[in-house]
Amino acid sequence: MTTDASPPLQRAESLRAFKIRAVIVHLACLGVFFVPLTSTVLWTAVALYFVRVFSWEAGSHRYFSHRSFKTSRTFQFILALLAALSGQRGVIWWATHHRAHHKYSDVSPLDQHSPRFHSLWHAHFGWLLSQRALDTDLTQARDLARFPELVWLNKYHYLFPLGLLIATFCVGQYTAFFGATGLGASAVVWTFFVSMVLSQQAAFLLNTGLHGVEPGWFRYRRFATQDATTNAWLLAIPILGGAFHNNHHRYMNSARSGFYWYELDLTYLVLKILSWLRVVWDLVPVPQDVLDEGRKSKGHALPGNP
């Protein structure tokens, strides 16, 4: 059952509460200097980093923001839940801001992520520091707001990272999963806080590292889009293919950001496997004319300032 009865504006927690939580999350990462580290803790942190990146790249980004593939309502909720566990708020909130980013990308101050119109600090993280940015305008994502479970999860997204934090501590403290008992603090610091903060920074880097920076030895600009985006092959693995950002801005509805075989897009590879299993389907391809355009390209400089 879906509904259209949701109020147009979903209020978030207070800005003060958000700031306090953000400070705590980042300060907690300093715990790496005070807790023991086992190989199991480290590899679990690495694995959860990639799970978190996949959750927002495949879920919040390609599915909820751009509808680049289809899936069941059950798996849709699983994607939304995983995205909440990444610490990037609810998927409706994520999609409304990202759709606005594409609408005004690097051509208007309304693109809150653009380093062309705002400071690097504002484009990277500072844009979050207002009550307006934290609230969710459900009218900007009516296709998602018709699902009451997504609206609920969007409002109470913080409950799930909190539950994961508690579970992580209990597993580390009272079981030998990480190599010994008594590793609750280590597990929390590394597999929860460090893993989550790094995955968040990877998302923020798409705004400040791949917008408005001239092409260089690891950045290239295949398409002459109106925005100032580039691709960054060096970040392909850490961001699971999301770093082919100029490609994405040329055709944002595709299920893949690495348009060619040599552009490693691990998110798309996972989606392809899931499509073979019929968990997802109707992956939107890159149109042939766009592929041909890219093959003929010899690279482009950034557009002039608007």
Feature roles, as predicted:
Residues D143-L150, G216-F244, Y251:
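Active-site-proximal inter-transmembrane loops
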Residues Y174-S186, G212-T230:
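Intrinsically disordered, low-complexity coil segments
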